[in-house]
């Protein structure tokens, strides 16, 4: 998921339909695609927009959470099973729980080369 996630951060949604890269489903709101291969999907509705000097911050209210039972331990989400990753800056690296799993603005470039 790292390479395709990075690719989605590299290309503009105005020029590329990113939803075609994934098998998607729609949740309770029926308004935004959720990704089947993601172990965890959090469906949100917009609640606030904050204009920042160089970006816009969108804040959402959680409507529903989608998580398969295989990612639970004693009825609770198990982060080691889910294996979420995040982007840190300014080093531009993706990290999983306790380990780096990719490099931002590099792995997506490699993935882009595989798109016809």
Question: Where does each model-flagged region fall?
Answer:
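Basic, polyanion-binding surface patches
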Residues: 1-116
């Amino acid at each position: 998921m790292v390479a395709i996630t990075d690719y989605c951060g590299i290309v503009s949604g105005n020029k590329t339909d990113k939803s075609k890269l994934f098998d998607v489903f729609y949740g309770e709101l029926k308004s935004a695609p959720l990704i089947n291969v993601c172990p965890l999907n959090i469906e949100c509705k917009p609640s606030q927009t904050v204009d920042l000097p160089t970006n816009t911050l969108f804040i959402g209210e959680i409507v529903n959470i989608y998580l398969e039972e295989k990612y639970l331990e004693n009825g609770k989400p198990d982060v080691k099973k889910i294996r979420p990753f995040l982007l840190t800056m300014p080093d531009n690296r993706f990290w999983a729980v306790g380990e780096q799993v990719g490099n931002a603005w590099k792995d997506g470039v490699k993935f882009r080369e595989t798109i016809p």
